[in-house]
Curated annotation (Swiss-Prot):
This is Homoserine O-succinyltransferase. Keywords: Acyltransferase, Amino-acid biosynthesis, Cytoplasm, Methionine biosynthesis, Transferase. Transmembrane segments: none annotated. It is found in: Cytoplasm. GO terms for cellular component: cytoplasm. Residues 51-360 form the AB hydrolase-1 domain. The keyword Chaperone does not apply. It holds the Pfam family Abhydrolase_1. Pathway: Amino-acid biosynthesis; L-methionine biosynthesis via de novo pathway; O-succinyl-L-homoserine from L-homoserine: step 1/1. Homodimer. The active site is at 157 (nucleophile), 323, 356. Substrate binds at residues 227, 357. GO terms for biological process: homoserine metabolic process; methionine biosynthetic process.
């Protein structure tokens, strides 16, 4: 447990909560009359508010992207390798905002929050959300913080989709967009993975139609299975082979169906167990649906280039060679569309064995390329 933080850490951070009482109209046709967004900031906003950077999180992410909440924390925020003094998102230059999206389960209003109309958790009655809904709520947070334009909006995976949506929905409010390990829409295979995960949750007897909190239980089995399926897709075959191979937990096989025999089985069960204790099942359903629904070109005759016609941002698109969840081909599809739309775009394909999760890992070439781009941003 650290008693002193590394010199390139943002150190101790305190989450803040912004309450919004103006109704937020949603794509599903419903509205939230009021809601909270929890967020953290790192660095200082300059006098002209020209150095603000928004971090958009992925499916299971949250607002705590960097630094520590306590001297007793064993781990820093989920993107600490990229945010801090001298790091790619340099807090000596940038004022960084990271939030937990609406519908989340880490402090922003979501399914586990109390519904003021009933006094009970929203549960399955919480409205289905889209990436564009998130961007609208994020824009309100920007207004609250006095930020009229982001120097950059940055995200990996689902976070990259939010960054892209910002350039479409609020084209004049983003100067740079960094979409990392992302895609312009999900493939049929990706939607299928999400559906398997959802069915694992929905068919868990402890789900209770989404009202499990009222029953004092959680659909642990369903969440475990959903996370196990998802986690397989975040890793590459090579990285799993190198880390686990066919290694056994003990010296011999047990010849049954219940024992944890292979090391990879143990790893997946641990990941599922840990996840089921900290994540809300209804939030998981919401996040996967937002992923499935993201398809901005659908509003432009499926013409991706036309989708970005009004974007004014400069784009940086990054992918990783062994990412099969959001493959380099999907990033190149995005780059081709941006070039067809005559946008300023650079593309980086990083050779990395870690698969989709590579965007979270401090790979030297990745950090170097990331830093190089961020250092070019004028404030």
């Amino acid at each position: 447990m650290p008693t002193a933080f590394p010199p390139d850490s943002v150190g101790l951070v305190t989450p803040q909560i912004a309450h919004f009482s103006e109704p937020l109209a949603l794509a599903c046709g419903r509205a939230l009359p009021a809601y909270d967004l929890i967020y953290e900031t790192y660095g200082q906003l300059n006098a002209s508010a020209s150095n603000a950077v928004l971090i958009c999180h992925a499916l299971s992410g949250h607002h705590h992207a960097a630094g520590y909440h306590s001297v007793d924390d064993r781990k820093p925020g989920w993107w600490d390798s990229c945010i801090g003094p001298g790091k790619p998102i340099d807090t000596n230059r940038f004022f960084v905002v990271s939030l937990n999206n609406l519908g989340g389960c880490n402090g922003s209003t979501g399914p586990s929050s109390l519904n003021p109309d009933t006094g009970k958790p929203f549960g399955a009655d919480f409205p289905v959300l889209t990436v564009e809904d998130w961007v609208h709520s994020q824009a309100r947070l920007a207004d609250r913080l006095g930020i009229s334009q982001w120097a950059a909006v940055i995200g990996g995976s689902l976070g990259g989709m939010q960054a892209l949506q910002w350039t479409i929905t609020y084209p004049d409010r983003v100067r740079h967009c960094l979409a990392i390990a992302s895609a312009p829409k999900l493939s049929a295979q990706n939607i299928a993975f999400n559906e398997v995960a959802r069915q694992a949750i929905l068919t868990d007897p402890e789900f209770h139609g989404g009202s499990f909190q009222e029953q004092g239980v959680i659909p642990k089995r369903g969440l475990m299975l959903a996370r196990m399926v998802g986690h397989i897709t975040y890793l590459s075959d090579d990285s799993m082979g190198e880390k686990f191979g066919r290694g056994l937990k003990s010296e011999k096989l047990n010849y049954d169906f219940h024992s944890v025999e292979f090391q990879v089985e143990s790893y997946l069960r641990y990941q599922g167990e840990e996840f089921s204790g900290r994540f809300d099942a209804n939030t998981y359903l919401l996040m996967t649906k937002a992923l499935d629904y993201f398809d901005p070109a659908a509003n432009c005759d499926d013409d991706l280039a036309k989708t970005f016609a009004h974007a004014t941002a400069k784009f940086c698109v990054m992918s990783f060679t062994t990412d099969w969840r959001f493959s380099p081909a999907r990033s190149r599809e995005l780059v081709d569309a941006l070039m067809a739309a005559r946008k300023d775009v650079c593309y980086l394909e990083i050779d990395a064995p870690q698969g989709h999760d590579a965007f979270l890992i401090p790979i030297p070439r990745y950090l170097q390329a990331f830093s190089h781009y961020m250092n070019r941003i004028t404030l």
